[in-house]
């Protein structure tokens, strides 16, 4: 109900020409409707913008979380390369465009477990734990990153290498833990393998080695190391880069053997969250330094190592994970 404003108006009636005439006061009540003005302020709702959809889908995160390279977009979805190198159709997923960093958790699946520590710790699981922690750290720093595998499934070396090229990455780091155990050492036996013809790979390798060595040296452990441990090229007897994750990608790449899972004291350390946090943070520092500075790192070994590693998992033993 509107409020009423009551105004008392006093009328004075006077007799003409008679100053002493009686004055009659007539009270009059006038009712005036008051006007209430209401101002409506529009409500503004702030929401986060949806993720940017790349103009070209270079890779895809499938509904099951597997990252695959995209061969082409189709009317019904995507044609992709599976982790085992097969072609498959996927109806939906999260498209990925150009990505700054690709992290490769070495090994994976039932057959390719990698080395196993005396405490039962499997290299494939440890590599993934470190890689996922590194991914989370890089995301916090505003750096785009994707993993070549996101769970315990097999993935062929050529497919992993191709993913880095497919997303036009600035760099790739393949994460590993070493075996067999060499002789005792006063410091960690971190080894970083680099591309023999790439100065960028050499610079990245030096940054990775320096940061990881500094982080691991804070732990009181009976370390083991090879005599030539450091940043080095590893060549096959044919004279080529020996490791598939080094020779395969066009992308600037390094393979980091962080320390020796085959050494029991080191394996006990690797089973702790403190280790995973320390080494992933060190790797993130190295990546950020590579992308934002001209720093060159340290630990370079002049003479290449000659070695013929075992080939990666073949197509006959590779079992693809579910994509949808």
Task: Please annotate each region the language model reported.
Residues 3-4, 8-324:
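Catalytic-site microenvironment of enzymes
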């Amino acid at each position: 109900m509107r409020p009423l404003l009551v105004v008392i108006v006093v009328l004075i009636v006077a007799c003409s020409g008679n100053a002493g005439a009686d004055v009659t006061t007539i009270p009059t009540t006038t009712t005036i409707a008051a006007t209430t003005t209401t101002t409506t302020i529009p409500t503004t709702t702030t929401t986060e913008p949806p993720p940017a959809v790349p103009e070209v889908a270079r890779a895809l995160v499938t509904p099951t979380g597997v990252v695959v390279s995209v061969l082409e977009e189709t009317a019904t979805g995507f044609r992709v390369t599976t982790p085992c190198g097969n072609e498959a159709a996927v109806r939906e997923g999260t498209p990925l465009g150009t990505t700054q960093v690709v992290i490769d958790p070495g090994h994976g699946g039932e057959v390719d477990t990698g080395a196993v520590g005396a405490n039962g710790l499997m290299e494939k699981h440890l590599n993934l734990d470190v890689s996922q922690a590194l991914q989370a750290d890089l995301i916090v720093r505003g750096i785009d990153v994707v993993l070549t595998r996101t769970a315990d499934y097999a993935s062929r070396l050529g497919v992993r290498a191709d993913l880095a090229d497919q997303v036009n990455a600035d760099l790739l780091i393949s994460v590993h833990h070493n075996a067999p155990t060499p002789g005792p050492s006063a410091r960690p036996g971190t080894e970083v393998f680099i591309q023999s013809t790439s100065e960028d790979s050499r610079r990245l390798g030096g940054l990775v080695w320096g940061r990881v060595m500094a982080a691991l040296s804070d732990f009181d452990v009976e370390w083991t190391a090879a005599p030539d441990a450091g940043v080095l090229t590893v060549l096959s007897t044919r004279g080529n880069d020996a490791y598939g994750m080094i020779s395969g990608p066009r992308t600037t790449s390094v393979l980091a053997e962080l320390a020796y899972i085959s050494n029991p004291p080191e394996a006990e350390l690797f089973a702790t969250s403190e280790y995973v946090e320390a080494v992933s943070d060190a790797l993130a520092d190295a990546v950020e330094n590579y992308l934002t500075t001209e720093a060159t790192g340290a630990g370079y070994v002049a003479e290449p190592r000659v070695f013929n590693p075992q080939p990666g998992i073949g197509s006959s033993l590779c079992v693809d994970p579910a994509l949808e």
